[in-house]
């Protein structure tokens, strides 16, 4: 069990103690807000032209793949789950098992700062359900309900 004390903002090196993901698949740069009582978390992803997915999505017109925005929301939910359970990245792996009501409203491009707001709806045993919105400049660019389950 982890006994770390985290002060906001939580930086990427601390996030790496909570999530098993690493470059190029760690999609959370900073935790800005966290309320474990209301199960609410806000995180940031700085979208850089140096992201490896921009090489092929799309050449000369880079757009962040929507599925990676959903993955980023799930990772933010994972941070909250680990903090809420007092665990670290190695305690138990969680996998995305379901996505519902995914919506993509606007393209995310290099230079954007993605702000992800995630609300945990429930956590029963090893299954967490979240609703998340990703925003750029205050405008919702993507949203989804995500379910993650711990590995057995």
From Swiss-Prot:
GO terms for cellular component: cytoplasm; membrane. GO terms for biological process: fatty acid biosynthetic process; lipid A biosynthetic process. Keywords: Cytoplasm, Lipid A biosynthesis, Lipid biosynthesis, Lipid metabolism, Lyase. Its main location: cytoplasm. SUPFAM superfamilies: Thioesterase/thiol ester dehydrase-isomerase. Its EC number is 4.2.1.59. Involved in unsaturated fatty acids biosynthesis. Catalyzes the dehydration of short chain beta-hydroxyacyl-ACPs and long chain saturated and unsaturated beta-hydroxyacyl-ACPs. Belongs to the thioester dehydratase family. FabZ subfamily. This is 3-hydroxyacyl-[acyl-carrier-protein] dehydratase FabZ. The gene is fabZ.
């Amino acid at each position: 069990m982890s006994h770390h004390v985290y002060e906001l903002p939580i930086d990427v090196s601390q996030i790496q103690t909570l999530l098993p993901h690493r470059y190029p698949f760690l999609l959370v740069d900073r935790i800005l807000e966290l309320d474990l009582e209301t199960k609410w978390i806000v995180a940031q992803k700085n979208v850089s032209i140096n992201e490896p997915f921009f090489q092929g999505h799309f050449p000369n017109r880079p757009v962040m793949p929507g599925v990676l925005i959903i993955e980023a929301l799930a990772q933010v939910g994972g941070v909250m789950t680990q903090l809420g359970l007092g665990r670290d990245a190695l305690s138990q792996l969680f996998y995305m098992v379901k996505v519902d009501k995914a919506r993509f409203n606007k393209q995310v491009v290099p230079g954007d700062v993605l702000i992800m707001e995630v609300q945990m709806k429930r956590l029963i045993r090893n299954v967490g359900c979240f609703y998340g919105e990703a925003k750029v400049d205050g405008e919702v660019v993507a949203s989804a309900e995500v379910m993650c389950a711990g590995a057995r």
